[in-house]
Amino acid sequence: MSFIQKQDKEIYEVIQNEFNRQNNNIELIASENFVSEAVMEAQGSVLTNKYAEGYPNRRYYGGCEYVDVSETLAIDRAKKLFGAEHVNVQPHSGSQANMAVYLVALEHGDTVLGMNLSHGGHLTHGAPVNFSGQFYNFVEYGVDQENEQIDYDEVLKVAKEHKPKLIVAGASAYSRTIDFKRFKEIADEVGAKLMVDMAHIAGLVAVGLHPNPVEYADFVTTTTHKTLRGPRGGMILCKEEYKKQIDKTIFPGIQSGPLEHVIAAKAVAFGEALQDDFKVYQQQVIQNAKTLANTLTDEGFRVVSGGTDNHLVAVDVKGSVGITGKVAEETLDAIGITCNKNTIPFDQEKPFVTSGIRLGTPAATTRGFDETAFEEVAKIISLVLKDPENEKALAEGKERVNTLTSKHPLYN
């Protein structure tokens, strides 16, 4: 940081302020995590200087002999992590990974079956404001109104009715185990290909704590951050038969030069994920999420679907304490707990207001938070959301947050 401090004091101040925010707050955004110093070091290395259009040993530029090695390491480690036949580590984001699969599997206007956004899906799974919903004819499946879990009978019914060319499984706000085998059976029954977006659960999948979609899906996409705890980026895993189509769709189809410094950071993160302690970490992520859900339930909050199987907890704050997700997010942010407002199934509020909040445990677990810490986190959340205008409660909540964060510094 010394070079930035000398050369650009404004950006230096931004970075320092952001570090302090991360260190002094409890991060509960389910899609965020804290990378290791090794991952950050790789991403900030001289590899950022290198242009490398193409793929290892098939580049359009000279001088790629070393980035070829790092990209190959990333590919091989990802294959080992997930048991994939082919991996492309070049997508700059999960959204671009999804776009590439759509371009391979579909023609403009084709019918696709994806999860309703307000039920836990993702923008790139057919939202009208997203390219996916504008280029393709998406039809939706959702969760059962009673148990708030995916209704596979409904998925089959909608699939039979609309005959999609592609079925998309995966979610951005779904706290239960997804039955990829069942999705594959449904896809086969209607003659569709299956794509799984495992961005949120990739870390759990890598260590065997969630069923692996690679066995069942034609295409699997993911981000490399979130539970996988790598740099921000994307990745595609697919059957060997789709290798050439996927690779040429990423380059030269929708991207040019790959970000080789980010790919090296992906390789480092995948190497970390192959170590035994990564499974211990993921086990703690799940235990912490269960503790968070159970304690909030004990405190009188309604947890969507009644609990969690993964890293994520969705909470109906409007139905529980009569405030919107927007108010809940702002109230928690004021005391140093960061989360995001989120629609819940059958939500009547607008997406920028919402009836719920989405909470996740990966980032705080990386800091060393255990079940005891998350029980305290849940009680702090309860304290302030039950009376969000109570200054005394807010002050107490902030003090208790500071006690937790001081015990678990972000980076030593």
Swiss-Prot record:
**In UniProt terms, what function does this protein have?**
Catalyzes the reversible interconversion of serine and glycine with tetrahydrofolate (THF) serving as the one-carbon carrier. This reaction serves as the major source of one-carbon groups required for the biosynthesis of purines, thymidylate, methionine, and other important biomolecules. Also exhibits THF-independent aldolase activity toward beta-hydroxyamino acids, producing glycine and aldehydes, via a retro-aldol mechanism.
The record's top EC class is transferase
According to UniProt, this protein's pathway is: One-carbon metabolism; tetrahydrofolate interconversion; Amino-acid biosynthesis; glycine biosynthesis; glycine from L-serine: step 1/1
PROSITE patterns documented for this protein: SHMT
Which UniProt keywords are present, listed alphabetically? Amino-acid biosynthesis, Cytoplasm, One-carbon metabolism, Pyridoxal phosphate, Transferase
Q: Which gene encodes it?
A: glyA
Cofactors (names): pyridoxal 5'-phosphate
PANTHER family with a match to the protein in the record: SERINE HYDROXYMETHYLTRANSFERASE, SERINE HYDROXYMETHYLTRANSFERASE 1
Q: An example of a Gene Ontology BP annotation on this entry? A: tetrahydrofolate interconversion
Extract the SUPFAM superfamilies matched here: PLP-dependent transferases
Name the protein family. Answer: Belongs to the SHMT family.
Alphabetical list of HAMAP family matching this protein: SHMT
Under the cellular component aspect of Gene Ontology, which terms does the record hold? cytosol
Q: Where in the cell is it found?
A: Cytoplasm
How is this protein named in the record? Serine hydroxymethyltransferase
Q: Which residues carry this modification: N6-(pyridoxal phosphate)lysine?
A: K226
Drop me one GO molecular function for this one.
glycine hydroxymethyltransferase activity
UniProt-listed InterPro entries:
PyrdxlP-dep_Trfase, PyrdxlP-dep_Trfase_major, PyrdxlP-dep_Trfase_small, Ser_HO-MeTrfase, Ser_HO-MeTrfase-like, Ser_HO-MeTrfase_PLP_BS, SHMT-like_dom
Known EC number: 2.1.2.1
Catalysed reactions, as listed in the record: (6R)-5,10-methylene-5,6,7,8-tetrahydrofolate + glycine + H2O = (6S)-5,6,7,8-tetrahydrofolate + L-serine
A family per Pfam: SHMT
Its chief place of residence is: cytoplasm
